[in-house]
Amino acid sequence: MAWSLRAWRRARALRRGRLDDALWRRALGRFSFARELDAGDAARLREWVTLFLHDKTLSAAGGLDLTDTMRVEIALQACILILELDIDSYDGWSEVIVYPEGFLVDQTWTDEAGIVHQGKVGRIGEAWLRGPVVLSWADAGAGMEGAESNVVIHEFAHKLDMLNGPADGFPPLHKGMNRAEWNQVFRGAFGDFRLRVRSGLGTRIDPYAAESPAEFFAVLSEVFFMAPQVALAIYPAVYRQLKLFYRQDPAARLALPVH
């Protein structure tokens, strides 16, 4: 009965919230990872985007004029992560707040000498446990052609990571996935990446990934969708784990060799 009620509610939301065809085609055309989808995947993504916009409140802040085009483009980027999962993956919270540009937040941190500092720091995105996602449109709208980073994918990867508690780079894995293997692969890659960054070695992956296991997972999720060839070349074992987790293979969509 509960399943039937949920299916009915979804069907009603899809009917009432049908996206404008021209708007949807434009949104698909702006993102390389969306243009690569076949017709069936694109149709499913459209359903998730429609349900996302039905379920979540997208609120403007800082004087931003949040248009329908912007809403759809944010939702599309958020929903590519759950294309082969379910919209329920984003249950438990209700709002996306969008600023025109980067924003300031209060933060307390401890430096390497053990001294505690307090102050305001700049952000282009944040994800709160059981709370909103906060985005800078200047950056959310930049994750398009040729980009290898994507703040929307980054923050929504954190949201998936938070399904089993505070973000720690260890989201709830699907049945059949090996927790020990995930841990071994990600710990090894994270340690290697931190060493690269601290040694001043060049890398195409954002150095911010060295901040913590949670940030490593979120940044590698960006690369997985935006530049799968980079993830394959640098951390193929991580790519394989993300392929299992997201149940997608972006490299195959590009006809790239998979190791």
Predicted regions and their residues:
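Metalloprotease/metallohydrolase-associated module, dominated by Zn2+-dependent proteases
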Residues: L14, L23, G29-S32, F52-L53, ...
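Ser/Thr-centered flexible coil motifs
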Residues: D20, D38, D65-T67
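Acidic, metal/ion-handling microdomains and their immediate structural contexts
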Residues: S32-F52
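Active-site recognition of the HExxH zinc-binding catalytic motif
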Residues: D38, A147-N164, A218
